[in-house]
Amino acid sequence: MKELAKQYDPSQVEDRIYQFWQDGGYFHTEADPDKKPYTIVMPPPNVTGQLHMGHALDNTMQDVLIRTKRMQGYAALWVPGTDHASIATEAKVVEAMRAEGLTKEMVGRDGFLERAWDWKTKYGNRIVSQLKKLGTSCDWQRERFTMDEGCSDAVKEVFVHLYDKGLIYRGNRMVNWCPHCNTSISDAEVEYEEKGGNFWHLLYPVKETGEMLELATTRPETMLGDTAVAINGEDPRYAHLHGCHVVLPLLNKEIPIVCDEHADMTKGTGVVKITPAHDPNDFEVGLRHDLPIVRVFTYDGHMTGAADKAAADALFAAGKNTVNEPEVLDCGKYAGMTTLEARKAILADLKEGGFLKEIEPLKHEVGTCYRCHSTIEPMVSKQWFVKMEPLAKPAIESVEKGEIKFVPERFTKNYLNWMKGTRDWCISRQLWWGHQIPAFYCDDCGETVVAKEMPCTCPKCGGSHFTQDPDTLDTWFSSALWPFSTLGWPNEDSADLKYFYPTNTLVTGYDIIGFWVSRMIFSGLAYTGKAPFDTVCIHGIVRDSQGRKMSKSLGNGIDPLEVIAQYGADALRFMLLDGSTPGNDMRYSEKKVEAARNFANKLWNATRFVLMNLPEDFQPGLPEESKLDMSDKWVLTKLNQVAGAMTDNLDHFEMGLAAAKINSFIWDVYCDWFIEIAKPRLNSGNAEQADTARRVLVYVLDKALKLLHPFMPFITEELYQALPGSAETIMTQSWPTFDEAHNWAEEEEAFEKVMDYIKAVRTMRTEMNVHPAKKTSMIIETADPAPFRNAEVYLAKFAFATDVTFTEKYEGSTDGMVQVSTHTARGFIPMMELIDREKELARLNKEKAKAEKELAMFENQLANPKFVERAPAALVEEIRAKRTNSQSKLANIEQSIKALG
């Protein structure tokens, strides 16, 4: 038998155990016709990222599921991988180049990509090694990257397929533009923050009447791009202005007054300025009224100037402009200013000209980039889009029919709301790192050819020279294909794809249901004809101890690797799961980590005790039932119940409940009770009794380690290998299940009667400060003495009884006796010679006063007819039960006071 160290040191165990698992190939899975598959694909963390608490929670949950299914006999595959993270990675590389005095343009696209791949190689393995520290049992032989050859092939296949079906198109549309990242981003990537601002009330003169039209805007710098003012056609206040014009202040330019329902008669003055190039609603108004689209911002957040206008004019002159192509304004004195600088200058000029009426402070939601948190500029830009309506419909139906379930179910609504409200998806990004769009433009005639590879001949003019579109695809485009691109698609003959797809469970946070979950669902249905998974298990975020979101700005982030270094990975994993509930946020608690570490130490010490009491020739296995005593059947029944309950919990993704159950069983049932109960038999001198106790101790420990293994894999592996008769690894052992043969309900109930009585006696002795060495006789009054008679050895050991008398009704003298009561027994214990009488009387009188106050409170509640009539019936019954308990408690205290004279 393996000898365990005196104390558990995770730093001496975890790396060695993980290497043992990897060397043994225990994480690797192949298609097996004799087994059912169970597949999880890891949400790929950013290749430049590092492990944070969200990763730790997400991957611990996945590991619990995959380890459990592996032990349940499934061909359990967990596919790991990383995401190329276009925006984040490009920003990192650009920042590193800036430190060298270089820009992207200086080194060129090829030079930049070479640096980006070097960066990926240097930092890409960091988060993988950190995930291994956590104990993740991924099939690392199948590790994937969203820009590896297989994923790239899948991306091209999908793009060409969608384009050929008319579901991908290129056009000038309103997009969310990040001036810092210098790229468009999708609606899902815009985060909204409440910020302070103003409504600036401006006055626009009407050309035909000379009157002033008042309107309000939060962005006065956009007024240079106004191409109309809108009123509601039903608004009687402005009926006389139909067909009129206003003169745009500062530019002295005539623009029309249009009638459009976008102008709400009930809000403000009912007049709105229309800037089609820089507002999504205004863009739609512009399309309805065929208004010019005039861009006044550059892509890096400055006001446009003469050079910008000249470039745009040249495009129009050459006939290369496309539908909805924006004109560009030379903003004159404001050209080159940042948008905020221009705002100040424009407002000053408006005020000077008498066009600024008033300023109204307000709080409003401002769109920001999810990566850099810069303010998003709505911008009309030529981009690639996916038509969402045809793809969204089957994805909505699949969830509504129950083919895909969300856990908790409430997140189904989030998903459906997102899918039903989604607009066409802008998939092009003005970046170099990522999947370059497989669209090629003929250098001779400008024809667009979409193909997986560079075409040889132009189908329109026969030319042979092409330029590939410089933009890359949204990172989420490739991530949307992750469940099947990682399993061999588009090769539909792939053995892995046939066996492991569709996958089973997706574990992810609620914050990326729109970003990622929705896109995987419609992609799986569109390209494979199957939903990519059947269950989406949603978890919350890990907050700090005060309930705040962890962030760099608050400085409240907790590094999981530091926690692992101090407490071990098992302690961190258990803290994250114990008591957690699906879909809800949780708080990081160092006290809970310490408690998990203490739990590991408790288990270690218990295992050492068991091993130290085994002879060299010990052979594991339960003895025949006739040799089991009441306590053996009790602990085996408890183990059986826990195995059944945990299996049910895990089937329903209630990992927190499952963790709490095995914690309670090992600590409370096995360590605090059964080991202590076994000691008298181990030391009894009776070889058969000692052997039975040993066998039950080892059997229960073996099963408990297996139940705990998915949650705390390192310590359970180390302890399991120390048990006599253990196999090579706990990972591949069978998961314990409910066994009717080990369900002794009567013995369980009987033994718990004894336990309750022992607990009551020990509590009483503790309260009365009686030393454990002081023992006394006792009389037990009970209608069912059999369990107590069968447990006299335990009453002597744990209730400190010298001898026990049993009676159905005790009618003797109670002088000098203290009473203890449970729901099935009452004990009369002579305590006078063991205690300080005066001190005990003082304590009892204090307890009596407390009990009387408690009873009075319950009686007052029940004496109030309004409470009894209006309160929920269950609450009234609960108060009545508490009153009854208080009455019984008070009676026992009074009896004890009387006994002490």
Predicted regions and their residues:
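N-terminal, positively charged nucleic-acid-binding surface of large information/translation enzymes
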Residues: 1-234, 275-288, 292-311, 343, ...
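Short hydrophobic beta-strand segments
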Residues: 37-43, 49, 273-274, 443-445, ...
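Secondary-structure transition/capping motifs at alpha-helix termini
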Residues: 67-75, 96-109, 129, 133-138, ...
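Feature 926 captures the class I aminoacyl-tRNA synthetase adenylation module centered on the KMSKS loop
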Residues: 201, 417-477, 481, 526-569, ...
